């Protein structure tokens, strides 16, 4: 299972990329697109990607909160919230994400969505599930704190919906996910998205593809120097 920071995973690829994110973070969705653009520019680069939890609002009630009330309180006013989200919409359009913030009615607690992402790693469909959750929340306006929505997302990603329903119901891995979130903060992660490449290099925020490409080049340069005969 992904969660050791060093991460103890069987990475046999040329590069591993660990992504710390939250499922209600629009910049994480944008950052995913920018990373994908960088990877598309390097088609020969084999990567293994693992997603890790960071709850932006860990104290959110289990049932979530009314979206308008929550964002108005968070940003000081409904007008300020709209202004900020309009700016994010523009950033999303640049990477072909049609954010539909007006459609979102609930701001969910994201713990259960992170539990599901954890299980998706073992199922071999983690990246696909993250994409599905982003789409369902930011574009379709679904409540990704709702177990029915999470089960549907899991099924769409190819997971066993019966098993997922059982795991969600019995509270499996709640503490493990919370512990990993805490570990990320202890390592210095204070905002998301946060990308760790080969356990050595960090890219913080939804940076442009050029930032990832520069990191790829630095890693290749460093590894070539390490492998060079003395």
Q: Language model features by range: what are they?
A:
Residues 22:
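Acidic active-site catalytic centers that drive phospho-/nucleotidyl reactions
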Residues 11, 17-19, 30-47, 51, ...:
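C-terminal cap of thioredoxin/glutaredoxin-like
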Residues 25-28:
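Short cysteine clusters
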Residues 33-140, 226-230:
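Structural alpha/beta surface segment adjacent to cysteine/selenocysteine redox centers
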């Amino acid at each position: 299972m992904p969660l050791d920071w060093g991460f103890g995973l069987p990475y046999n690829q040329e590069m591993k990329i660990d992504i710390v994110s939250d499922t209600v973070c629009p910049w994480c969705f944008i950052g995913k697109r920018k990373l994908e653009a960088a990877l598309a520019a390097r088609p020969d680069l084999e990567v293994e990607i693992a997603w890790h939890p960071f709850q932006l609002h860990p104290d959110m009630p289990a049932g979530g909160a009314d979206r308008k009330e929550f964002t108005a309180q968070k940003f000081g006013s409904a007008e300020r919230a709209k202004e900020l989200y309009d700016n994010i919409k523009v950033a999303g359009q640049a990477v072909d994400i049609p954010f539909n913030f007006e459609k979102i009615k609930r701001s969910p607690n994201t713990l259960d969505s992170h539990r599901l992402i954890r299980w998706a790693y073992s199922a071999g469909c983690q990246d696909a599930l993250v994409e599905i959750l982003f789409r369902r929340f930011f574009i379709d306006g679904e409540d990704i704190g709702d177990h029915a929505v999470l089960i549907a997302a899991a099924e769409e990603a190819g997971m066993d919906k019966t098993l997922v329903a059982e795991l969600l119901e019995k509270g499996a891995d709640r503490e493990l996910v919370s512990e990993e979130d805490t570990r990320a903060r202890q390592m210095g992660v204070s905002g998301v998205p946060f990308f760790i490449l080969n356990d050595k290099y960090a890219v913080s925020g939804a940076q442009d593809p050029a930032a990832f490409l520069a990191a790829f080049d630095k890693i290749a340069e460093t590894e070539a120097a390490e492998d060079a005969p003395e």
